[in-house]
Regions:
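Extracellular loop and loop/strand-boundary signature of outer-membrane beta-barrel proteins
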Residues: 7-12, 134-137, 231-235, 296-301
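Transmembrane beta-strands of outer-membrane beta-barrel pores
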Residues: 27-29, 43-49, 155-157, 166-170, ...
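Repeated loop/turn-to-beta-strand initiation elements of outer-membrane beta-barrel proteins
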Residues: 33, 157-160, 255-256
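Short, small-residue-biased leader/transition segments that mark boundaries at the very start
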Residues: 1-6
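Extracytoplasmic gating/loop element in the C-terminal half of outer-membrane beta-barrel translocons
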Residues: 169-266, 271
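Outer-membrane beta-barrel "beta-signal"
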Residues: 22-24, 305-317
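Conserved small-residue
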Residues: 11-17, 21, 28-139, 181, ...
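Membrane-embedded beta-strand positions of outer-membrane beta-barrel proteins
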Residues: 25, 39-41, 162, 267-269, ...
């Protein structure tokens, strides 16, 4: 008999509306006869929204598209801090049905997720847009207000130029197994940084990080589910401002360069990625946080942008 292979055809199952704008300004001026300067920058913003998609009930809106979804949405829980005492933990366990998240009892140092719909259960409801239980949109990964700032000034052969770039608003939320963020887990590649030492203990009640659970890969999730759900407590701002380039140069006087048979000579110093301003934990680079590496796809577990220092000479014969 003969065999026949039929390939499904590609179809366009969704429509989106993209809106954005961009502004760019540049000004050059002169002070006296020797000082020349310029200053400028750009600012751009764009968002996307789903306007048509075959998901009428909005099933699983945190992972699926639905009409009205803002591209980049992050769904998660609201949290009201960490449980501090065994009495508080017992009350939390006895008051709420937490079985959707974990079969383990909550302990001091675990995250206190909030019951937004007051049904005494912490869950995602029917997992539809109309009933997501205690989950809601807590952030968005879309980079907003991307900008550059540049300036230069020169005086009698000495020049200074610099360029900053950044993003004004962007969110990033660590996943359950993002050990690079949590600093604990089941795998050998768990890396502990100084930031992770600020974890909860009775002596450190105001800690940022919750209980650092570790254990076998097959059993740790039931413990990690008590602390590492996507939540507003651990929502990160991936906004940043970075000095991408700084260059200082000096044009040697013609009388000097001509003595050695050159028509022009310039010495310069250049630096890239010299300064970065961000609220992210110190182990993350804002330009690399949404990508992984060849070994693991874990977001942010990547080499940071290199700082590059250069010194050189440019000559014209």
């Amino acid at each position: 008999g003969s065999e026949m292979c039929i390939r499904d055809s590609n179809t366009n199952n969704a429509r989106m509306r993209n809106r954005g704008w961009e502004l760019s300004l540049q000004y050059r001026g002169k002070i006296g006869k020797d000082i020349h300067y310029s200053i400028g920058g750009s600012l751009a913003d764009a968002t996307s929204e789903v306007t048509a998609y075959e998901n009428p009930t909005g099933t699983n809106p945190q992972d699926n598209w639905y009409v009205g979804k803002k591209v980049g949405e992050i769904w998660g829980y609201k949290a009201s801090g960490l449980l501090q005492t065994q009495e508080e933990a017992d009350t939390y366990n006895n008051t709420y049905d937490l079985s959707f998240l974990s079969g383990q009892k909550w302990m001091p140092g675990d995250v206190k997720y909030m019951d937004l719909n007051n049904d005494k259960k912490i869950n995602n409801g029917n997992n539809t847009l109309e009933d997501m239980g205690d989950m809601c949109v807590i952030g968005n990964t879309t980079p907003r207000y991307q900008y550059t700032l540049n300036g230069s000034i020169s005086w009698k052969g000495i020049s200074l130029s610099m360029m900053f770039q950044g993003i004004g608003k962007r969110n990033w939320s660590p996943d359950l197994g993002t050990v690079y963020f949590w600093g604990s887990g089941a795998y050998a590649q768990v890396t502990v940084f100084n930031d992770h030492l600020d974890y909860w203990t009775p002596e450190n009640p105001d800690a940022y990080y919750p209980n650092p659970y570790t254990g076998a890969a097959g059993s740790i999730n039931q413990f990690r589910n008590k602390t590492s759900q996507k939540s507003d407590r651990y929502m990160q701002s991936a906004a940043y401002c970075r000095l991408k380039n700084l260059t200082i140069s000096y044009d040697l006087p013609n009388s000097w360069s001509q003595k050695i048979g050159l028509s022009k000579a310039q010495v310069f110093f250049s630096g890239e990625n010299l300064l970065t301003f961000t609220k992210l934990p110190s182990m993350f680079d804002p330009e690399a946080i949404f990508t992984g590496n060849d070994y693991t796809s874990e977001a942010g577990k990547n080499y940071p942008m290199n700082k590059v220092l250069s010194i050189g000479v440019i000559v014209n014969l």
